[in-house]
């Protein structure tokens, strides 16, 4: 395997290797090695990112790789160069791996057909997939709970526009999780692997082992999908009161960025969630993914 474009690119062996390696890195987060010494990794992000871009940079550099991050706002795209030509020109410089984020669903899969000999990671494409975030969430849940099978996992928020939801549902359902999606009717779509659909928030999180919250992706909303953020928060924000309906050992997750006071209260985000642990796990998981693609294939 030389590309990670969708979560279904990974078989059980791949995922087990990534999990085991990630946990080693997580438990030894202050230890650097040179497993990627001499490798050049290009970050090509056509869409805004804080956590994902920083996480990949830190992961690559801590493994000894050289990283090149392209500032798209000052690239030749401003002179009329197409996205495809930009990627092809970067590839012609023979990097060992290109990490791409795009606002266009399926774009990275399409461009990969022109780059058969290049290692590529999909760092998020439109509302299609975000496979590395799903692996981070899988590893985080398994690290804390010890398993995925038979866990009640509620994914709440803007399901319709969420690449994180799609990748997580595909991965977690494969390992036997009972997945509920919780959202207003206008932010729901039919996805294979979902056990239950709820429009009532309390019903959707009742008896949950894991609550995964998603922000409203207003930048992708083209139609009238919610009346207001205030009404959405009133009906769908996780707070200390409705959190009591979940299991006592529930873990609260969020892939970021969070909009506190909309999908999650300040108190729950800061006192009851494992959001920062997810971020720490993100570096460990991305180290494992980079090593798997560049050292074990």
From Swiss-Prot:
<dbReference type="InterPro" id="IPR006130">
    <property type="entry name" value="Asp/Orn_carbamoylTrfase"/>
</dbReference>
<dbReference type="GO" id="GO:0005829">
    <property type="term" value="C:cytosol"/>
</dbReference>
<feature type="binding site">
    <location>
        <position position="256"/>
    </location>
    <ligand>
        <name>carbamoyl phosphate</name>
    </ligand>
</feature>
<dbReference type="InterPro" id="IPR002082">
    <property type="entry name" value="Asp_carbamoyltransf"/>
</dbReference>
<feature type="binding site">
    <location>
        <position position="101"/>
    </location>
    <ligand>
        <name>carbamoyl phosphate</name>
    </ligand>
</feature>
<keyword id="KW-0808">Transferase</keyword>
<comment type="pathway">
    <text>Pyrimidine metabolism; UMP biosynthesis via de novo pathway; (S)-dihydroorotate from bicarbonate: step 2/3.</text>
</comment>
<feature type="binding site">
    <location>
        <position position="215"/>
    </location>
    <ligand>
        <name>L-aspartate</name>
    </ligand>
</feature>
<dbReference type="GO" id="GO:0016597">
    <property type="term" value="F:amino acid binding"/>
</dbReference>
<feature type="binding site">
    <location>
        <position position="52"/>
    </location>
    <ligand>
        <name>carbamoyl phosphate</name>
    </ligand>
</feature>
<feature type="binding site">
    <location>
        <position position="51"/>
    </location>
    <ligand>
        <name>carbamoyl phosphate</name>
    </ligand>
</feature>
<comment type="similarity">
    <text>Belongs to the aspartate/ornithine carbamoyltransferase superfamily. ATCase family.</text>
</comment>
<feature type="binding site">
    <location>
        <position position="79"/>
    </location>
    <ligand>
        <name>L-aspartate</name>
    </ligand>
</feature>
<dbReference type="InterPro" id="IPR006132">
    <property type="entry name" value="Asp/Orn_carbamoyltranf_P-bd"/>
</dbReference>
<comment type="subunit">
    <text>Heterododecamer (2C3:3R2) of six catalytic PyrB chains organized as two trimers (C3), and six regulatory PyrI chains organized as three dimers (R2).</text>
</comment>
<dbReference type="InterPro" id="IPR036901">
    <property type="entry name" value="Asp/Orn_carbamoylTrfase_sf"/>
</dbReference>
<dbReference type="InterPro" id="IPR006131">
    <property type="entry name" value="Asp_carbamoyltransf_Asp/Orn-bd"/>
</dbReference>
<dbReference type="Pfam" id="PF02729">
    <property type="entry name" value="OTCace_N"/>
</dbReference>
<protein>
    <recommendedName>
        <fullName>Aspartate carbamoyltransferase catalytic subunit</fullName>
        <ecNumber>2.1.3.2</ecNumber>
    </recommendedName>
</protein>
<dbReference type="GO" id="GO:0006520">
    <property type="term" value="P:amino acid metabolic process"/>
</dbReference>
<feature type="binding site">
    <location>
        <position position="163"/>
    </location>
    <ligand>
        <name>L-aspartate</name>
    </ligand>
</feature>
<comment type="function">
    <text>Catalyzes the condensation of carbamoyl phosphate and aspartate to form carbamoyl aspartate and inorganic phosphate, the committed step in the de novo pyrimidine nucleotide biosynthesis pathway.</text>
</comment>
<feature type="binding site">
    <location>
        <position position="257"/>
    </location>
    <ligand>
        <name>carbamoyl phosphate</name>
    </ligand>
</feature>
<dbReference type="GO" id="GO:0044205">
    <property type="term" value="P:'de novo' UMP biosynthetic process"/>
</dbReference>
<dbReference type="GO" id="GO:0006207">
    <property type="term" value="P:'de novo' pyrimidine nucleobase biosynthetic process"/>
</dbReference>
<dbReference type="GO" id="GO:0004070">
    <property type="term" value="F:aspartate carbamoyltransferase activity"/>
</dbReference>
<keyword id="KW-0665">Pyrimidine biosynthesis</keyword>
<feature type="binding site">
    <location>
        <position position="133"/>
    </location>
    <ligand>
        <name>carbamoyl phosphate</name>
    </ligand>
</feature>
<dbReference type="Pfam" id="PF00185">
    <property type="entry name" value="OTCace"/>
</dbReference>
<feature type="binding site">
    <location>
        <position position="130"/>
    </location>
    <ligand>
        <name>carbamoyl phosphate</name>
    </ligand>
</feature>
């Amino acid at each position: 395997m030389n590309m990670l474009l969708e979560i279904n690119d990974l078989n059980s062996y791949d995922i087990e290797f990534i999990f085991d390696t990630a946990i080693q890195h997580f438990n030894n987060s202050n230890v650097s090695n040179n497993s990627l010494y001499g490798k050049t990794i290009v970050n090509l992000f056509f869409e805004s990112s804080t956590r994902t871009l920083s996480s990949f940079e830190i992961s690559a550099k801590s493994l000894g790789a050289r990283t090149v991050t392209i500032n798209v706002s000052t690239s030749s795209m401003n002179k009329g160069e197409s996205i495809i030509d930009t990627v092809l020109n970067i590839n012609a410089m023979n990097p060992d791996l290109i990490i791409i984020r795009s606002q266009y669903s399926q774009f990275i899969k399409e461009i990969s057909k022109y780059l058969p000999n290049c290692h590529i990671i999909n760092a998020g494409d439109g509302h299609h997939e975000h496979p590395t975030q799903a692996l981070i969430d899988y590893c985080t849940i398994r690290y804390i709970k010890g398993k995925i099978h038979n866990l009640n996992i509620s994914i709440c928020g803007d399901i319709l526009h969420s690449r994180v939801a799609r990748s997580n549902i595909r991965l977690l359902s494969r390992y036997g999780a009972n997945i509920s999606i919780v959202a207003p009717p206008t932010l729901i779509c039919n996805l294979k692997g979902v056990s239950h659909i709820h429009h009532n928030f309390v019903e959707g999180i009742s008896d949950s082992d894991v609550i995964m919250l998603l922000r409203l992706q207003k930048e992708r909303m083209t139609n009238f999908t919610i009346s207001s953020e205030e009404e959405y928060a009133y009906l769908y924000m996780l707070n200390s009161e409705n959190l009591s309906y979940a299991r006592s050992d529930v873990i609260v997750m969020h892939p970021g960025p969070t909009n506190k006071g909309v999908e999650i209260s300040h108190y729950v985000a800061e006192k009851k969630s494992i959001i920062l642990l997810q971020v720490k796990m993100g570096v460990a998981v991305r180290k494992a993914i980079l090593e798997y693609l560049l050292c074990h294939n």
